[in-house]
């Protein structure tokens, strides 16, 4: 049985599918000494040598193990690999891999802090991010503005934002953390559109003044993980997260 090259290499952690496709376009990937094309399928029986940017790599699943790390992102860091403004980048804080590279499972904007997951398994990252799988993301949200029962109902039932409708799966007040000017909430979404939570509150004339992600799927931000630090998930936790999208650890 054959599979597309970008799917295989993405699954084995050599980059996202888009990144693999770009490398193919630039002639950076070859099989048995011949450059390949996007969409080309692989049959393992016919492969002798595969190289990426001149370095020989293995595509045997027995040589690959899915890794996932949790990073506690501080405010002020961005979730891209390069930034012309020279702002701090989350990838610079992660442990080095050999030829594989970390793939972010979703993003947080520069002013949001908290849980970020990274994996070396491209297929797993894609599945965990895909809206159809409805993976829960949970946040602490500090809000400034006039909020009443009707406001909460609107946010649960759905509000119109720039790229369509959006609604919290659940949202509740954290009473002990509220002040006269700001109120804290715990909210759950099942998707991760750009600045979605901030846009939802803006649609009801309120402003998010702090946003912290505390959970992705069944993975919670450890209370003892300091801002700017990372920790690797156990094999059991990797399998539990993978099972949410019916993918077992490789």
Swiss-Prot record:
It catalyses: uridine(2605) in 23S rRNA = pseudouridine(2605) in 23S rRNA. Pfam families: PseudoU_synth_2. Transmembrane segments: none annotated. Keywords: Isomerase, RNA-binding, rRNA processing. GO terms for molecular function: 23S rRNA pseudouridine(2605) synthase activity; RNA binding. InterPro entries: PsdUridine_s_RsuA/RluB/E/F_cat, PsdUridine_synth_cat_dom_sf, PsdUridine_synth_RsuA/RluA, PsdUridine_synth_RsuA/RluB/E/F, PsdUridine_synth_RsuA/RluB_CS, RsuA_PseudoU_synthase, S4_RNA-bd_sf, TruA/RsuA/RluB/E/F_N. Its EC number is 5.4.99.22. The active site is at 109 (nucleophile). It comes from the Bacteria. The keyword rRNA processing applies. Residues 3-73 form the S4 RNA-binding domain. SUPFAM superfamilies: Alpha-L RNA-binding motif, Pseudouridine synthase. GO terms for biological process: pseudouridine synthesis; rRNA processing. Disulfide bonds: none annotated. PANTHER family: PSEUDOURIDINE SYNTHASE FAMILY PROTEIN-RELATED, RIBOSOMAL LARGE SUBUNIT PSEUDOURIDINE SYNTHASE B. Responsible for synthesis of pseudouridine from uracil-2605 in 23S ribosomal RNA. Belongs to the pseudouridine synthase RsuA family. This is Ribosomal large subunit pseudouridine synthase B. It comes from Buchnera aphidicola subsp. Acyrthosiphon pisum (strain APS) (Acyrthosiphon pisum symbiotic bacterium). The gene is rluB.
